[in-house]
Amino acid sequence: MKFYKYQGAGNDFLIADNRDGSVQLTTAQIAALCDRRYGVGADGLMLLESSQEYDFRMVYYNSDGSGGMMCGNGGRCIVAFAADMGLNHFDFEAADGFHTAQIIAQEGMAKTVRLKMKDVEGYEHHSSLTGPNCASDGYFLDTGTRHYVRFVPGLDAYDIVTEGRDIRYNAEELQPVGAYVNFIEPYEGGIRVRTYEKGVEDETFACGTGIVASCIASYVNGVRPSQAFEDGRIGYDVKAKRDSLAVDFIPTDEIVAQDVWLTGPATYVAQILVEID
């Protein structure tokens, strides 16, 4: 079976072209392929499938084989993959609905992709959470994936894996399915974000839907945007573990964030042939 490996801001994925429907993988097989010690290794696996309404369908799985959610970095990577497969338009369906994208720059194997995300209609502010080791102030939002966002000082030294795992598993307000947990520290000109990812159960180099959630929570919390435009749109520059991304949206009275766009890198890494048991 042929896979292609792509990474978006260090968030890496195995992708297969399944427009003919021939790729059928079990949860255990996906987890085995994504295992970094005994498999190929990736944060997630995606299938590019045919769609009756749009140019293609994105099917996303976490590294543990769970699915049913949107992945922002994965969305940019599957657009880059679709372009490499010869597609010229990028209207597609995902677990959370319709998306569109544009490739706005390319240098070598790296593309810069601008991806339209879902509108975010509301949020929940929790002054504290109920559960062991979960007494933390933060915001819950759904950006295609469930996210909890915390503002913390000293982000570089912060133990986000321990606290992220506690919140993901123990916070009663987020159960029964839990949530990704994001930690933010504003800086002059933007925000820095680190994310504990549910399904990976560890920190990843970046999380696209988490970065979107973090930018919207920053707006709600009064963090000054990096840019403000005449049409009312605002933008935030974001630093992940190593790469920089950008989010822009229109805040409105009716919903929190409308016409949301995530811009960042998507890079081809390798082609891989795998025998599946």
Named regions from a protein language model:
Residues 1-110, 149-277:
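A glycine-rich beta-to-alpha transition motif near the start of alpha/beta enzyme domains, typified by
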Residues 119-121, 143-147, 266-268:
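Glycine-rich beta-alpha junction loops
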Residues 119-138, 165-167:
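Active-site glycine-rich loop that binds ribose-phosphate moieties when present
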Residues 130-132, 136-158:
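Internal active-site segments that recognize and position negatively charged phosphoryl groups
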